[in-house]
Each structure stands twice: as structure tokens, then as C-alpha cells.
Amino acid sequence: MENRIFIRMVGAMLLLCVVFTAFHGSERRIRTTIDDAFKYAVEKDFQNRKLYLTRNAASNIRYGVRDYALSPSFDRKIVNYSLRTPTGIHTYQFKDSISEETAKRFLTQHLLEKVHRLNPNHVKKLFLERLEEKEIDAQVGVLCLRDTVRHWSDADSVVPKNVYSTPRQVLDITGKIKVQAWADYSVGTV
């Protein structure tokens, strides 16, 4: 009799371990999908704002912004990037060498912020669309930090407790513009 009870207990513990492992793996996959969906939304917003430069007349765009944002980048590593402005030449120095394409993306984000700012509501909409494509049902919010000023999607600064927050992404060359999202998904999604 004791042998049967022991076997049932071991079986139950093994079943619990399998269920826990499957649940934990599913949650990790969902969080990875949420991170990827947010990166996609930020990238798509960047491309949409960059497209804004090509559609507007040069008189609407500040000095040199269009030239820098739309010029090609080369496949090489750089340690600094120079920008000509009406007040002179500004040089941005990097700690390590980075690809010119990455530096150009950071610079373009910085310049776009002056003519067509990132809108957390638009990023949130793109984020939700991507999550729906991936069949993840969640409440989400987006935070954009400009220096120390916080801009929330839907002007809502209340984040529910126990939600998943994506890693904060630095967008511009100065490191002053950052975005982050949170997602509150149900256990049924896992």
C-alpha cells in the first residue's frame, strides 16, 4: 500500500514539475514576443516619421535635417559623427566604434525629434496591432522620456502592478530620448 502511495506522489510531483516548466517556458516566450513587438512598433514609427521628411517641402524642414536623414550610410565602423548646424559643427563621440548605420539612426532620431516628435499614442497603436497579429491579448502603455520629462500614451501615468515592462530603449545620439512599454497579459495567454 505504501508503495502505491509513494508512486502516486512521485507521479504527481513529476506532473507538477512538467506543468511548471511548460508554464515558465510559455511566459518567457510571451515576454520575448512582447519585446519583439515593441521593437517592431518603435522601428515602424521611426520609418513613418522618416517618411515625413520625404513628403514635406524643404521650407518646412530645418537646416540640413533632410540631407542627413536621407543620405546613405556606409558599411564601416566610426567613433564620432559630425553634424553641421546653423550655429556650427557638432561632433558626437562614441565610447566604442559603432556601425555608421547605427550612428546615423541615432542621429536621425535626434533630428526627427526637432521636426516630427515621437508620439507615444502612435507607438502604442502600432504595438497593439503587432501583439494582435501574434495573438497576444494585453493591455499596454508606452512611456517616452525626453531628458527627465515623461510622456505617457493616453496621458495615463498609472501603470498596473505586476505587469511586464520591456527594456528601455535609447533612441537618439544624445541618449536623452528613451522609450519603454508595459504589457498586462492574462494567465490564459500563457
Predicted regions and their residues:
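N-terminal signal-anchor/signal peptide hydrophobic helix marking the start
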Residues: 1-16
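Single-pass alpha-helical transmembrane signal-anchor segments
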Residues: 13-20, 190
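Signal peptide cleavage region of secreted peptide precursors
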Residues: 23-26
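The feature marks either
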Residues: 18, 28-186
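Membrane-interface helix-start motif
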Residues: 1, 184-190
